[in-house]
From Swiss-Prot:
SUPFAM superfamilies with a match to the protein in the record: UDP-Glycosyltransferase/glycogen phosphorylase (SSF53756)
Key word Flavoprotein present: no
Pfam families listed in its UniProt record: Glyco_transf_4, Glycos_transf_1
Entry EC no(s): 2.4.-.-
GO molecular function, one term: glycosyltransferase activity
Keywords: Glycosyltransferase, Transferase
Protein name (Swiss-Prot/TrEMBL): Uncharacterized glycosyltransferase MJ1069
Organism, scientific name: Methanocaldococcus jannaschii (strain ATCC 43067 / DSM 2661 / JAL-1 / JCM 10045 / NBRC 100440) (Methanococcus jannaschii)
Family assignment from sequence similarity: Belongs to the glycosyltransferase group 1 family. Glycosyltransferase 4 subfamily.
Amino acid sequence: MRKIKLIIFPGYYIPHIGGLETHVDEFTKHLSEDENYDIYIFAPNIPKYKEFEIRHNNVKVYRYPAFEIIPNYPVPNIFNIKFWRMFFNLYKIDFDIVMTRTRFFSNTLLGFIFAKLRFKKKKLIHVEHGSAFVKLESEFKNKLSYFYDKTIGKLIFKKADYVVAISKAVKNFILENFVNDKDIPIIYRGLEIEKIESIGEDKKIKEKFKNKIKLCFVGRLYKWKGVENIIKAYVDLPKDLKEKIILIVVGYGEDLERLKKLAGNYLNNGIYFTGKVDFEKAIAIVKASDIYIHSSYKGGGLSSSLLQAMCCGKAIVASPYEGADEVVIDGYNGILLKDNSPEEIKRGIIKLIENNNLRKIYGENAKNFIKENFNWKKSVKEYKKIFERLVN
């Protein structure tokens, strides 16, 4: 079998922190174990890092000059000659397959242009991570984003040779708004289970709050994640229950200062923010906690942080959004809420605070569920079938 040359255009790539970034990095790590694949990544250089590096088993990463026109939406710096030089150099390589991820990133449009707007077209596989239209603070930006989705986004779905959804929620969103193809496959991500299991719990947090039940959230701090509803739920708890618990918010983002203000007198007195931490530290904090809260609004495909918390054996309180209703089985491995309102989150928290045995049962079941359903060997095998179909 000849080598298949694959280039991926992700919206972001590490060291930028997020579920998409780890998804792409772990996917390429496991795919690159097969020497029949020659893998390239072309991504915005945010935050500024090495312009070129080789990762895993000869995965070649190119990071081009870029900036964020609004938070979480990078665009190439078209005024920098280096961007154009890097982009046009890609045309010197005879790729078999181009992979884009998430329709609304400018890098997805770049990948589409590279694959389809040329004399010798390339096979394009689009992997969608989103399950709702973009919601921003500005109504004008929301309308602009919706228009982009319904024009450029829809074109990408229609012209792609293959479309993959990362969850059922994503597939339903695609079918309702872009293309009517019920054969779109759902391929769940894997998890680095051995790596997660090798990380110990955060002993400082465990010791400092040894007499408290520890609630935890991990993720990028922006409106989509619904963290303000966790804080409101905490504040609204009866005083006797509040005295039994603490809330640890792990992550950073444009909403960090707003959320700190919302915490009010409970900031560093019941509600604690870690700011930006690396993967190992985040997992260590989750392991030191007792309950993990997933508070997302509709939008994401399948929360990596939620899956990782389940892998850590934590009892889950989850809104039904961002794929949670596909992995959290109410009354078996967690509490699946009706929505992400403060009232619902409060209900879930109270139920688990008052029942230590239930927390242990849910946590054990969550861990087993992840081990049985989310492994990269299975995921990569499904992608390989698609790649081989496209090139043969």
